[in-house]
């Protein structure tokens, strides 16, 4: 494939990803919600109370350090409680203050996301998901190959 065509594809996809990021930034700042807190709190909502920090890292694709520091911040602000499970696991539970924060800030943002997706016909949504999955898989494969070449 000619480099120019690839550059245009790359510029196009990176532009769209930047635009999505900008929209999220605007939405999160309108509620004064830091991105890490949004991701962790929405993960707790998805996974259910009693979930583990490890599960949040795995499903959110945030690194463990980011999840850990966000969990500590949420605990300090009394939005969550950590309860010991089988060592070394700590189960995460929302406090009343955390549930209120979730209701007032996190759920409305998720509802905005959901409404945008509801406007897409199912066939377009499936095409979007399939295309995105293919791009992610291809990208991951080439990153792995790049890393393998650079190990030598």
Task: Please name every model-derived segment.
Residues 1-4, 123-152:
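C-terminal regulatory/oligomerization modules of transcriptional regulators
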Residues 1-31:
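N-terminal leader segment of winged-helix/HTH proteins
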Residues 9, 16, 36-37, 52, ...:
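N-terminal positioning helix adjacent to the helix-turn-helix/winged-helix DNA-binding module
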Residues 13-20, 24, 101, 105-117, ...:
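Alpha-helical linker/hinge and terminal dimerization helices associated
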Residues 14, 42-43, 58, 103, ...:
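A cross-family signal for key residues in well-ordered alpha-helices
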Residues 22-66:
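N-terminal helix-turn-helix DNA-binding core of bacterial DNA-binding proteins
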Residues 72-130:
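Charged, amphipathic alpha-helical coiled-coil/dimerization segments
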């Amino acid at each position: 494939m000619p480099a120019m065509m690839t550059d245009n594809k790359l510029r196009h996809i990176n532009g769209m990803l930047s635009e999505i990021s900008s929209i999220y930034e605007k939405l999160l700042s309108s509620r004064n919600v830091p991105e890490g807190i949004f991701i962790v709190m929405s993960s707790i909502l998805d996974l259910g109370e009693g979930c583990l920090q490890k599960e949040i890292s795995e499903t959110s694709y945030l690194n463990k350090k980011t999840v850990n520091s966000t969990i500590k911040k949420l605990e300090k602000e009394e939005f969550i409680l950590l309860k010991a499970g089988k060592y070394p696991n700590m189960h995460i539970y929302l406090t009343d203050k955390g549930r209120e924060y979730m209701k007032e800030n996190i759920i409305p943002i998720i509802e905005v996301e959901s409404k945008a997706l509801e406007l897409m016909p199912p066939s377009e949504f499936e095409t979007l998901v399939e295309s995105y999955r293919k791009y992610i898989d291809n990208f991951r494969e080439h990153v792995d190959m790049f890393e393998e070449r650079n190990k030598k």
